[in-house]
Amino acid sequence: MAIDKKKKEKDVKVHNITDAEEKKKALETAIAFIEKQFGKGAIMKLGDARAMDVEAIPTGSMMLDMALGIGGVPRGRIIEIYGPESSGKTTVALHIIAETQKMGGEVAFIDVEHALDPVYAKNLGVDIDSMLVSQPDSGEQALEIAEALARSGAIDCIVIDSVAAMVTKAEIDGEMGDTHVGQLARLMSQAMRKLTGVVSKSNTTCVFINQVREKIGVMYGNPETTPGGRALKFYASVRIEVRRGEQIKDGGEVLGNRTKCKVVKNKVAPPFKECEFDIMYGKGISRVGEVLDTAVDLGIVKKGGAWFSYEDYKLGQGRDNSKQFLLDHPDIMAEIENKIKASSAEMIAAAGQKNDKKSKLEEKANAGAGISEASEPDSSAEEDFEEFAPIDIGSLGE
């Protein structure tokens, strides 16, 4: 047995190449072999893979787009939107669908909760005639449908609402009081492993909506957690926490509420940024409220005390009056909105230039290191290198 092992180990040769030209040739040979085995594009340089700038789909909220750092949710990635009940999770997801459709993309909504309101979706700007909808019977079915759609390469955005509502086949077949510990977590773990590569290759944005639960017996720290195990937390490129704020009232009538979003995880830009916007009942994210708030943050609209002003215009006293002024003067609102878009585009471009500068400096440093290494005389002769055969541990005891 020891002789057979040694024979096998001797057949596998590992070359120690010191010459730079030989290294380059050896690498080209290795790449050619890998492409022959696994197909063209199995291995490539990162710069050749695709455009370095991450493509994004707007969320329908300017404030949230700015908080995400790239102007929306990234394409070809897994996204998680979670929060308490009635906080605006589905509203944000439907706005992402509407924005995808505006860009000419195909969308799908996997309604695990069986609670999608088509009238509300239409009010938010979703083209319900072209949106694909599925109401699966089990969690396995929901994830298989999502995988099949992503694998087709024809869908630009898939929304799964929600992870917490998924029920496994074993749970459906069992009795009401039966315990099924960790089944959803195992299902999600397997699904994430399969989905990640598929959505990346097809450039599909996969949005998972999730609820929150409380861990029992937590004395210190945040007792809240999300169902479905840890897999989704790891595989998601972006995690957005959505929470409901104070109510928006007109006299005694409640018209909507302030919604707070926090980017808890972000693999494409700096995380932990927060934003607030208005969600109006039956209408979705308030565009005029966002324009006003963003313009104030960027210094386009000036705020002095309770008064809001833009150039020579007095918008009004108080936020509600200023919003009404912008609604009554759509030309001024459009002008402010264009300035906001230009300003946010400049901010994203500046962030990109910063990253490019950093990578160029690294390249320069690496190139300099390569030149200094090449200029040094090779003091080591070939005789100084010995080929060490691996020691057979089994033979030591003989």
Swiss-Prot record:
InterPro entries: AAA+_ATPase (IPR003593), DNA_recomb/repair_RecA (IPR013765), DNA_recomb/repair_RecA_CS (IPR020584), P-loop_NTPase (IPR027417), RecA-like_C (IPR049261), RecA-like_N (IPR049428), RecA_ATP-bd (IPR020588), RecA_C_sf (IPR023400). The keyword Nucleotidyltransferase does not apply. ATP binds at G83, P84, E85, S86, S87, G88, K89, T90. One of its GO terms (cellular component) is cytosol. Keywords: ATP-binding, Cytoplasm, DNA damage, DNA recombination, DNA repair, DNA-binding, Nucleotide-binding, SOS response. It is found in: Cytoplasm. Residues 375-389 have a biased composition (Acidic residues). GO terms for biological process: DNA recombination; DNA repair; SOS response. One of its GO terms (molecular function) is ATP binding. Residues 354-365 have a biased composition (Basic and acidic residues). Gene3D superfamilies: P-loop containing nucleotide triphosphate hydrolases. Residues 351-398 are annotated as: Disordered. Can catalyze the hydrolysis of ATP in the presence of single-stranded DNA, the ATP-dependent uptake of single-stranded DNA by duplex DNA, and the ATP-dependent hybridization of homologous single-stranded DNAs. It interacts with LexA causing its activation and leading to its autocatalytic cleavage. Belongs to the RecA family. PANTHER family: MITOCHONDRIAL DNA REPAIR PROTEIN RECA HOMOLOG-RELATED (PTHR45900:SF1), RECA (PTHR45900). This is Protein RecA. It comes from Ruminococcus albus (strain ATCC 27210 / DSM 20455 / JCM 14654 / NCDO 2250 / 7).
